[in-house]
């Protein structure tokens, strides 16, 4: 794989750490800022909303900016946002910092996905996207547990300072490794690019993404409280459990990419979503047992991110058919869909916790993922009806 993909993965590592470390710090932040656990959970939703707004709008507005220059600018914005979080004196300031970093996140992953697919032959597109998103999974393996440890022992502000340092490292890595001659979309007007919202098949993919991730985050947002209050883990060991989850996620992400390359994204997604439904249902019964919940979290990690390569490569392929003038924007809208799902899942999870309790989140999340599975099955049927092949023919990488 090209070195540029590793540069993208390095940036994704920094972004993934700041996105997901908040899950392990929710109880700590709630106690520090004197807010409720559901209120602290809104920090997940606000970040996701920043991504959802920033991804399509800023991607469309920056369509004429050279890709490498844009990547570097985004990482600078990301680093500044984490510095604001480090210095945040109260809950409102921390919320603003989360939105700011979310704006950078959305555009990074939208253009990063299309860059990744253009660096390799087309039949390796899902694996290339998986490699870039490996940065997120490695963040779960190392960044999130370490960040959780730092936050619990040195204050949550110290975690964001550490992530700012990661941002600087990512800027240097991208400046050195990302080439300047990557092919982008042909320049087009903002209205032309946003016309992807009129494409029913793309809207179907966005709905698949929103439900698939929304269902997961109904439960995942409150994993730390479940581990502490239901399973009986000490707060100091939550980071270790997140490490177990992250190791499994790293394997699942690569596995999901290879599955999508081998069998096509739709078939891969059907399999992954079905497994995710099963794991969330099992969690409803295993949470009170420390050994069993550890095994369930391990299985959860293996499928939780296994759908990312398939969803992202599928939206790129659909956009190349339905909106070839706005592939980056179509990709960005799928990043927005991921984060709309995260925001709605975290918000809905808070309502569920407040009214039904923590242990209602896994089985309700499973029901939402069933919706994603049904929509994926519909997408596959429509592809077969239209004669769309499950896997593309070989096409060389695209450079200027």
Feature locations, PLM:
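C-terminal membrane-cytosol helix-exit motif in multi-pass small-molecule transporters
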Residues: 164-184, 376-379
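A late C-terminal transmembrane helix in Major Facilitator Superfamily
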Residues: 321-356
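Paired small-residue
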Residues: 6, 77-84, 92-101, 291-299
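Intracellular juxtamembrane helix-capping segments at the cytosolic ends
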Residues: 108-120, 306-322
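Conserved MFS/SLC helix-loop-helix module at the cytosolic interface between two early adjacent transmembrane helices
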Residues: 53-92
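Helix-breaking motifs and short loop linkers at transmembrane-helix boundaries and internal kinks
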Residues: 34, 66, 87-93, 232, ...
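Cytoplasmic helix-loop-helix junction between adjacent transmembrane helices
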Residues: 97-136
